[in-house]
Amino acid sequence: MNLGEILSSVKLPRPLAPELAQTEVTGLAYDSRRVTPGVLFFAFPGSKADGREFAADALARGAVAVISESLAPPDLAARWIQVEHGRHALALAARTFFGRPDERLGLTGITGTNGKTTTAYLTDSVLRAAGGVTAMIGTIEYHLAGRVLKAVNTTPESLDLLQIFSDLLRAGGTHVTMEVSSHALALGRVHGLNFHTAVFTNLTRDHLDFHGDMERYFAAKQMLFEGAGGNPPRFAVLNTDDEYSRRLRLHARTERLWYGMTPEADLRPRHIVSSFKGLRFDLQFRKQRFTIESPLIGKINVYNILAACATGFSYGLAPEVVARGIASLKAVPGRFERVDEGQPFVVVVDYAHTDDALRNVIAVARGLNPRRVITLFGCGGDRDRAKRPLMGKAAAEASDFVVLTSDNPRSEDPLTIMNDALVGIRRTDVAHVVEPDREAAIRRAIKEAREGDIVILAGKGHETYQVLKDKTIDFDDRAVAREVLKGYGYHQTQ
């Protein structure tokens, strides 16, 4: 494919020189280290480095041209193509280069603050129950037709995303379910893609260090339902109990499927039974009613299940297929995940890292009628500082005992982060301890537990690392908790 063909959908300020337009392109790259002769290099600013600084290196490695928002340096002008939006150009060029694979796949995008990951796992399970050959892309990992790949971002860069789509098609793939983060929408990583179904879970405070305020955060989420540079989705799956869902602007051609607890919802649960064994309820879908059973714990997961069911219906799946897919998902890593060594109390690990998510996970625990709830949490560094006291207050108001510790401090002083959260805790009279060493904090939380208690280790969930100021270390809340329990003499026997 030549350069002119690859850039045919990209708006250029001036036509390409005929000789340049006819140049054959063998691949695309946004990292100069991946450039080989014949590759087209896209140079745009990243979070840690600016690709424009590596343009000369890319050309020296054999790049056919450089695509950038910036004016061309005089010495590179002959092979420099200026565009209005570098990431949009990459997304559109990659889509052309890989033959528009999104048009040949059932593409579902799931956005919102909480519940994206669980909803994605459930949706993927439903589609596989229908016989689909699927990919799932999200926070924990990427699944590609039975293979598991490490997740770099919740939503990959557009080039990597389209490569996954292309690989899936070659493997006989039919559907992709993906978490679509607000960062990905704002940065154009899904620009130009055609989604069959767009799902909105909810919107609460998060990522304001990036977006600035809630309206900008919401505006980023809105982009998925407007088409994000492609056609608007055929279906929008919306939470009738979330105020931001009701504010979304939708294209007239987009069919709405509402889910929630209110009578006007298209999908509504009846007779919910929640226990340590999971969930069971009757699902009312318009004039149909059938039973849903799931091993997932907690009424908050009813919303995630409803969203996944609605997505299945958007693809025309039968209720019995949808129900089978929901029942077959046994657990989601790091989402109310139990650590069981036969102890007389419950220990769970959960990814909750906002005040709303903390309230939700503690509410799930309360719904299981424990003697006490002991909550361990921390706040991430280099993120929205204003949410820290809100998280402290949420944990303190809903728990019987709180252990405040470090999360991923990144470049910040862990004690400064903890002091911010402590402001919220001290607005209550809850018993609490402060322990900056996360391993020692987990030991303290478990030591506090007695028969009938639930210990929640919140914030890191599935993560197997901790990001410190000058390094990243191996750290898994689940593994640490298991070793602590064994150290106290507990050991699960089969």
UniProtKB/Swiss-Prot annotation:
Residues that coordinate or bind meso-2,6-diaminopimelate: 383, 407-410, 459, 463
Chain ranges for the short sequence motif Meso-diaminopimelate recognition motif as given in the UniProt record: 407-410
EC number assigned by the record: 6.3.2.13
Record pathway: Cell wall biogenesis; peptidoglycan biosynthesis
Sites where the protein binds UDP-N-acetyl-alpha-D-muramoyl-L-alanyl-D-glutamate: 32, 153-155, 181, 189
Required cofactor names: Mg(2+)
EC main group: ligase
Modified residues (N6-carboxylysine): 221
One of the record's GO cellular component terms: cytoplasm
PTM field: Carboxylation is probably crucial for Mg(2+) binding and, consequently, for the gamma-phosphate positioning of ATP.
GO BP annotations, alphabetical order: cell division; cell wall organization; peptidoglycan biosynthetic process; regulation of cell shape
GO terms for MF: ATP binding; magnesium ion binding; UDP-N-acetylmuramoylalanyl-D-glutamate-2,6-diaminopimelate ligase activity
Coiled coil regions in record: none
Reaction(s) catalysed (UniProt annotation): UDP-N-acetyl-alpha-D-muramoyl-L-alanyl-D-glutamate + meso-2,6-diaminopimelate + ATP = UDP-N-acetyl-alpha-D-muramoyl-L-alanyl-gamma-D-glutamyl-meso-2,6-diaminopimelate + ADP + phosphate + H(+)
InterPro entries, A to Z: Mur-like_cat_sf, Mur_ligase_C, Mur_ligase_C_dom_sf, Mur_ligase_cen, Mur_ligase_N, MurE/MurF_N, UDP-N-AcMur-Glu-dNH2Pim_ligase
Compartments, record wording: Cytoplasm
Keyword set, alphabetical order: ATP-binding, Cell cycle, Cell division, Cell shape, Cell wall biogenesis/degradation, Cytoplasm, Ligase, Magnesium, Nucleotide-binding, Peptidoglycan synthesis
Binding sites annotated in the UniProt record for ATP: 112-118
Job of this protein: Catalyzes the addition of meso-diaminopimelic acid to the nucleotide precursor UDP-N-acetylmuramoyl-L-alanyl-D-glutamate (UMAG) in the biosynthesis of bacterial cell-wall peptidoglycan.
Family in the record: Belongs to the MurCDEF family. MurE subfamily.
HAMAP family to which the protein is assigned, alphabetical: MurE (MF_00208)
Name of the protein in its database record: UDP-N-acetylmuramoyl-L-alanyl-D-glutamate--2,6-diaminopimelate ligase
Gene responsible for this protein: murE
